[in-house]
């Protein structure tokens, strides 16, 4: 915004925080009107891009506060219900204001207000994006509207991608190597591009997405993990994005920014537009795409039957737990997405076309059978989703629960101490969980080699299920038949263990469990 409008705009050529007041909304609506009506008939206009990497906002702003109070009233109906859930003493919803403890609580801080706050963050972001898109469409219904989230892996709980189908025509995302791909080791950045692409494709309307920002050149000071992609990097990442279904790849940036942060960094070309190894490989890929346009214009990824489920509920619990800086080093705020990516890489390496879907967005009720759904270290599972999982399995599908899946509900209530809501589904319950300082060897029935699991040694007791795996002290895995389908429950953290030794053992497990699905693919690796 203009510097004269607000103190926060002074000295800032770029500002991508969400709206902070009703007064700003009025001015923003007028800005959108003038901008859209001026450019909507310009032949150079292809799309409207709503904010750059939107996520941040002032939690104490008048607009955020008002929306928070409305959100709490809609969720709890009475202030007494809020007080009971949050351990608070409000007398009116108007007293609810942002509390920093929701994000940086001490060791014993109650989880419910923290989880609710992160849910509100998600919904407030969605509200802002919808407001902007609706105002654009008041004046232009011909051009597509898109957006580009940042840090899709780490911030998937904030981006309600399934809900965005009602807002955007196509999705995008920033995929900068020095920022968004660094959750995986350097030699696995291609898998990171594929993973972000699958998350976008799984949620986007009819799977439409772009790689809307791809790092084009060198970092000096502007990368979390500074690097310079070479021609082979760009070729791998671009073809990976296209192979995952991306309809467009946009560099940040083609040429260099002249002044300020990022000046002299990120460019595909040289400082005076000289050709580089990066620009040459880009030109060659463009020629290939043009030469084979008949194929690429209609090509799309094959729709597989194996799906990894992403749980925003789990990510919110880990955000509540992580600030304590206690416990196992690896089970931090990114533990769930890291475990999911271990499975993703293992499946990709064997040529399995695997989808990634949000837990609540997966089509549990589809009449298609023979599907496989994988829950990786999904520690927070709402009770409301479990009956849908049971019907999914009973209809003739398979569910694999690995790691500490189901250890809590979505509000950090431990599920193992009373009635385990997933017991009918998984065929038993966990009786104990013991920490070990080293990897634990477990043997799954039917596999020739042991699997290595991270730190925790689980002990399980079968009810309707049968033992499917053991360690040196007892049963640690169950297989259960429910209706026409089955479940495999391995509460040992084998995906987390694979981060030390590679994904080969995890791939062997996956191959044994999804063999019929692999055989149905038109192509796979031997």
Language model region names:
Residues 344-366:
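A short, well-structured beta->alpha microelement
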Residues 366-379:
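Short, well-ordered secondary-structure micro-motifs within conserved domains or adaptor modules
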Residues 146-149, 154-342, 432-448, 453-455, ...:
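Hydrophobic targeting/anchoring helices
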Residues 1, 159, 220, 260, ...:
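Glycine-rich, charge-decorated loop segments at or immediately adjacent to ligand/cofactor-binding or catalytic sites
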Residues 141-143, 204-208, 394-398, 485:
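A short helix->loop->beta-strand "cap" motif at the edges of active sites that frequently abuts
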Residues 1, 46-55, 149-153, 213-216, ...:
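Short, solvent-exposed turn/loop segments enriched in Gly/Ser/Thr/Pro and often Arg
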Residues 376-526:
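A conserved amphipathic helix/loop scaffold
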Residues 3-193, 199:
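Polysaccharide-binding and catalytic clefts of secreted carbohydrate-active enzymes
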């Amino acid at each position: 915004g203009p510097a004269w409008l607000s103190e926060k705009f002074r000295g800032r050529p770029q500002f991508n925080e969400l709206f902070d007041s009703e007064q700003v909304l009025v001015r923003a609506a007028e800005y959108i009107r003038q901008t859209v009506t001026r450019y909507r008939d310009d032949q150079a206009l292809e799309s409207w891009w709503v904010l750059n990497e939107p996520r941040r906002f002032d939690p104490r702003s008048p607009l955020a506060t008002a929306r928070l109070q409305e959100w709490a009233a809609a969720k709890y109906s009475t202030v007494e219900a809020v007080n009971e859930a949050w351990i608070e003493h409000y007398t009116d919803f108007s007293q609810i204001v942002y509390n920093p403890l929701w994000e940086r609580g001490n060791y014993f801080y109650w989880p419910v207000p923290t989880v609710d706050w992160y849910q509100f963050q998600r919904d407030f972001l969605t509200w802002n994006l919808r407001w902007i898109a609706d105002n654009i469409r008041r004046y232009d219904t011909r051009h597509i509207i898109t957006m580009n989230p940042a840090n899709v892996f780490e911030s998937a709980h904030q981006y309600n991608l399934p809900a965005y189908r009602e807002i955007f025509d196509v999705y995008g995302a920033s995929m900068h190597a020095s920022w968004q791909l660094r959750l995986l080791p350097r030699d696995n950045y291609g898998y990171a591009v594929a993973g972000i692409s699958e998350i976008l494709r799984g949620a986007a309307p009819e799977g439409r997405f772009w790689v809307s920002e791809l790092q084009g050149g060198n970092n000096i000071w502007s990368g979390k993990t500074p690097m310079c992609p070479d021609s082979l990097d760009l070729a791998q990442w671009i073809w990976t994005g296209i192979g995952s279904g991306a309809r467009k790849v946009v560099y940040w940036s083609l040429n260099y920014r002249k002044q300020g942060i990022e000046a002299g960094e990120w460019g595909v070309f040289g400082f005076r537009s000289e050709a580089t190894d990066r620009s040459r490989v880009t030109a060659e890929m463009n020629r290939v795409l043009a030469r084979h346009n008949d194929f690429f214009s209609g090509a799309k990824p094959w729709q597989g039957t194996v799906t990894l489920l992403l749980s925003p509920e789990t990510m919110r619990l880990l955000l509540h737990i992580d600030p304590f800086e206690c416990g196992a080093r690896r089970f931090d705020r990114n533990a769930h997405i890291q475990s999911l990516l271990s499975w993703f890489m293992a499946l990709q390496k064997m040529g399995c076309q695997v989808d990634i879907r949000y837990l609540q967005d997966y089509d549990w009720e589809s009449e298609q059978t023979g599907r496989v759904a994988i829950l990786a270290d999904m520690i927070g599972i709402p009770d409301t989703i479990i009956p849908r999982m049971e019907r999914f399995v009973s209809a003739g599908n398979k569910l694999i629960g690995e790691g500490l899946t189901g250890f809590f509900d979505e509000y950090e209530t431990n599920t193992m101490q009373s009635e385990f809501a997933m017991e009918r589904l998984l065929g038993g319950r966990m009786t104990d969980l013991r920490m070990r300082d080293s990897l634990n060897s477990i043997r799954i029935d039917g596999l020739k080699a042991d699997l290595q699991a991270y730190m925790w040694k689980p002990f399980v007791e079968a009810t309707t299920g049968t033992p499917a795996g053991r360690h040196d002290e007892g049963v640690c895995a169950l297989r259960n038949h429910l209706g026409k389908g089955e479940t495999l429950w391995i509460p040992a953290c084998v995906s987390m263990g694979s981060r030390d030794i590679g994904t080969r053992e995890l791939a062997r497990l996956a191959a044994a469990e999804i063999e019929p699905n692999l055989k149905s693919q038109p192509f796979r690796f031997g």
